[in-house]
Design a protein with these regions (language model features):
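Transmembrane alpha-helices and adjacent helix-loop boundaries
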Residues: 1-219
Length: 219
């Protein structure tokens, strides 16, 4: 292991990690927004929109992110829509992640027994109170494991951004391997930085899930 090489190119990986995290966070935030909207449409069975959401979810979940990125990055300019590589990464991640988030949120909402909502209404609660005090707390608790898994999955999927010339972690590792043939050192840094990004997400997700279950949500 060449530690001098690692020390020399560590700042390059730090810069790439910041770009990876920035695109990942923005893309995931949009994915959550898309997921919430789609889950609400499916849960309340909104006519027409429900079928549009179903088509979107199936299309998104059954095509690789790399194909989606190529379609956005190389296909959209053919119809006059041009995006930077960073924006393309955000859109691609949001498109893919939105479908996974939608399924997580939908399953969480549907895990709450209808009789609980009916009982709450019989006690005098209105629809907003039922949603806020009965359905959402339990649905959130049920959704957390899948939600955290989706975040980790999407952050790992950022590794394909190098295919559209984004100078992320994977691009940096491949570039250094091609230039200096330092495969072990380059991949070592790649693994270390992905662990630094993903492990905190996993730990925080587990703590939140444990805290909510301790508080009695979802039981």
């Amino acid at each position: 292991m060449n530690w001098e090489f690692i020390e020399k190119y560590l700042p390059m990986y730090e810069k790439a990690a910041l770009l990876t995290v920035k695109i990942g966070i923005v893309g995931i935030l949009f994915a959550i927004l898309v997921g919430l909207i789609c889950a609400a449409v499916q849960y309340y069975k909104v006519p027409v929109l429900r079928w549009i959401v179903t088509v979107y979810v199936e299309l998104s979940r059954n095509t690789p992110l790399l194909v989606q990125l190529f379609f956005i990055y190389y296909g959209f300019p053919k119809i006059g829509i041009r995006m930077s590589a960073e924006l393309c990464g955000v859109v691609g991640l949001a498109f893919l992640g939105g479908s996974y988030m939608a399924e997580s949120f939908r399953s969480g909402l549907e895990s709450v027994e209808p009789i609980q909502s009916e009982s709450a209404i019989s006690l005098g609660m209105n629809s907003r109170q039922v949603l806020g005090y009965v359905i959402l707390p339990q649905a959130m608790s049920t959704s957390i494991p899948a939600f955290v898994a989706n975040i980790i999955f999407l952050l790992k999927e950022t590794s394909v951004f190098s295919a559209i010339s984004l100078m992320d972690l994977m691009f940096t590792a491949k570039d250094l391997i091609g230039l200096y043939y330092k495969t072990t050192e380059s991949l070592f840094l790649l693994v270390v930085f992905y662990l630094l990004i993903l492990l905190p997400v996993s730990i925080v997700g587990s703590l939140v899930e444990r805290r909510m279950r301790y508080a009695g949500f979802g039981d």
